[in-house]
């Protein structure tokens, strides 16, 4: 299997294409185009009758897509979140869908996007810079409790309250407008430790997830993807942290496995699976990590939508599964051992 251009190295490239099982005349959707590494691989396997739809809410990614694939009649380009993919494709019409979650390497590498604590730039963090509130805008008006809740819920930051109090105190003296300002402030209030991870890592992740509604979009996108897939179609999702992966894993399991039965409850309708798990968690091997260290935290999961005949053969007793809920800052979490987290 050919490799993508060296200029951009998409994570788990070969595993994604194998998981999607791209066919010559199939219809595929890349819900997170980025710089098009996976999309190029799909196109290499499509014939003249194949079709590729690409989506991204980042205007820079859309510009790359139009420049790279604008002349290819097989490609349709749409700006927007994959949460709205149901508005782009009709139900049961797609053979494969890829969602490559989180922030892209180009977004991290450009200081002006405000995602990285390692590169000083405006404190923005929006994947769509034309929509919503920037990180600086939110931090300027959120209460210390709201900030602490976000840091704990989306970053699992044990020092969430301490950091939130420091942010509120500092903004009273001067506005927080730069990534370096925020990173230095967080580092100044964190306990000294031996961790090689930058002290602002969890906080930056949490604020970014909140600003972009990433987990809400993920749940909406998974539901939309299930409806858009044909029977036999494949859903491939790459996640980069435990919150994302938990949602993906639970979503796939909810539609693939009957929930545990309870002898004390009356017998329910038979459970009818909608998905079949193609793989467990797939991670990058050492050879990929040597070329692309950012793949270290990537986890790929693949599931296949079942046709009615396969669904009936997989029927089992069950009581149905309650709809999963992504974590929100309003959720109540246990207090951390140091008593600092909300």
Curated annotation (Swiss-Prot):
Residues the entry annotates as binding S-adenosyl-L-methionine: 36-38, 56, 82, 100, 107
Protein name per the record: Ribosomal RNA small subunit methyltransferase H
Biased composition (Polar residues): 333-342
GO CC annotation terms, alphabetical: cytoplasm
Region named Disordered: 309-342
Domain of life where this protein originates: Bacteria
Main location: cytoplasm
Catalytic activity reported: cytidine(1402) in 16S rRNA + S-adenosyl-L-methionine = N(4)-methylcytidine(1402) in 16S rRNA + S-adenosyl-L-homocysteine + H(+)
Keyword entries, A-Z: Cytoplasm, Methyltransferase, rRNA processing, S-adenosyl-L-methionine, Transferase
Intracellular or extracellular location(s): Cytoplasm
Function per UniProt: Specifically methylates the N4 position of cytidine in position 1402 (C1402) of 16S rRNA.
Example GO biological process: rRNA base methylation
UniProt GO molecular function: rRNA (cytosine-N4-)-methyltransferase activity
Family annotation (Gene3D superfamilies): Putative methyltransferase TM0872, insert domain, Vaccinia Virus protein VP39
Family listed: Belongs to the methyltransferase superfamily. RsmH family.
SUPFAM superfamilies cross-referenced by the UniProt entry: Putative methyltransferase TM0872, insert domain (SSF81799), S-adenosyl-L-methionine-dependent methyltransferases (SSF53335)
Its EC number(s): 2.1.1.199
């Amino acid at each position: 299997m050919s490799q993508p251009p060296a200029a951009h190295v998409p994570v788990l490239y070969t595993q994604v294409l194998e998981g999607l099982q791209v066919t010559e005349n199939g219809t595929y959707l890349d819900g997170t185009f980025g710089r098009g590494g996976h999309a190029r691989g799909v196109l290499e396997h499509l014939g003249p009758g194949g079709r590729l739809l690409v989506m991204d809410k980042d205007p820079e990614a859309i510009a790359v897509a139009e420049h790279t694939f604008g002349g290819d009649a097989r490609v349709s380009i749409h700006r927007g979140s994959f949460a709205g993919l149901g508005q782009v494709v009709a139900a049961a019409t797609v053979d494969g869908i890829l969602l490559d979650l989180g922030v892209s390497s180009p977004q991290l590498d450009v200081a002006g996007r405000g995602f990285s604590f390692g590169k000083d730039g405006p404190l923005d963090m929006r994947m769509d810079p034309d929509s919503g509130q920037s990180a600086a805008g939110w931090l300027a008006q959120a209460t210390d409790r709201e900030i602490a809740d976000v840091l704990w819920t989306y970053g699992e930051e044990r020092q969430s309250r301490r950091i939130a109090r420091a942010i509120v105190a500092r903004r009273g003296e001067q506005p927080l407008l730069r990534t370096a300002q925020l990173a230095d402030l967080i580092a100044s209030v964190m306990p000294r430790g031996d961790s090689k991870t930058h002290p602002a890592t969890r906080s930056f992740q949490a604020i970014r997830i909140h600003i972009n509604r990433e987990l809400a979009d993920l749940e909406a996108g998974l539901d939309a993807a299930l409806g858009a897939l044909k029977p036999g179609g494949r859903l491939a999702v790459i996640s980069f942290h435990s919150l994302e992966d938990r949602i993906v894993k639970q979503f796939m399991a909810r539609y693939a496995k009957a929930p545990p039965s309870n002898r004390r409850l009356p017998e329910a309708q038979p459970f009818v699976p909608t998905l079949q798990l193609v793989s467990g968690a797939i991670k990058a091997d050492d050879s990929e990590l040597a070329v692309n260290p950012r793949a270290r935290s990537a986890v790929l999961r693949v599931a296949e939508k079942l046709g009615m005949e396969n669904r009936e053969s997989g029927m089992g007793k069950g009581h149905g599964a309650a709809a999963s809920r992504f974590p929100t800052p309003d959720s109540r979490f246990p207090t951390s051992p140091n008593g600092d987290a909300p």
